[in-house]
A protein has these predicted regions:
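HKD-type phospholipase D/PLD-like phosphodiesterase module
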Residues: 2-186
């Protein structure tokens, strides 16, 4: 069964900027899709760097003119990566990535933010290899739009005031994430 972890907060609206998915440069985009590649290196066929270690990712964004997969030049845990960008303005320490920059409002003291987090794994339980890895979150405000992030990243996002590091199981296997922004006027 789907384990639901949900919290809704309605506080003061003026503390939240427009919600949007963010790319590697911190620019607002309508959507992005990320594929964290599985570990490519074996003892018989060693591959150096993030690709060999299972820390490389490729992405698409609504702003890419050619709409082709782009291999990121940085590992997924880098503060400027797509998942890590969220963290550049997050109030606690977790390795940064575009997902993290996108989620910064979740960890701020913004009082007008509604958030819903769902995960088919218990926050501090064992990783299951038999479930569908149903994970995601919704962030929304009355006037600043919303974000829906669907992903398969283990134990993500962390609870506020908890640290996060990309898990070893996440390095071995491929992971996906998709972020969609909505405008409050739509």
């Amino acid at each position: 069964p789907l384990l639901l972890r949900a919290v809704g907060l309605l506080l003061t609206l003026d503390q939240v900027a427009a919600l949007s998915c963010l790319d590697e440069q911190g620019r607002a985009v309508d959507w992005w899709i990320l594929y964290k590649l599985p570990k490519q290196s074996t003892s018989k066929h060693p591959v150096a760097g993030p690709l060999g270690e299972g820390r490389a990712y490729a992405f698409l964004t609504s702003s890419l003119p050619n709409q082709r997969w782009t291999l990121s030049s940085m590992p997924i845990e880098d503060p400027n990566s797509m998942p890590g960008q969220v963290r550049t303005y997050v109030c606690f320490t977790i390795p940064s990535t575009s997902i993290l920059q996108t989620l910064a409002p979740l960890y701020s003291n913004a009082s007008s933010l509604f958030h819903l987090l769902y995960n088919d794994e218990e926050p501090h339980g064992k990783t299951s290899f038999t479930r569908g890895h149903t994970k995601g979150l919704v962030l929304a405000t009355k006037d600043s739009g919303s974000i829906w992030l669907i992903h398969s990243i283990p134990h993500y996002p962390p609870f506020p005031n908890e640290t996060y590091s990309y898990p070893r199981t996440g390095q071995r296997y491929g992971q996906t994430a998709m972020c969609v922004s909505t405008n409050s006027k739509r």
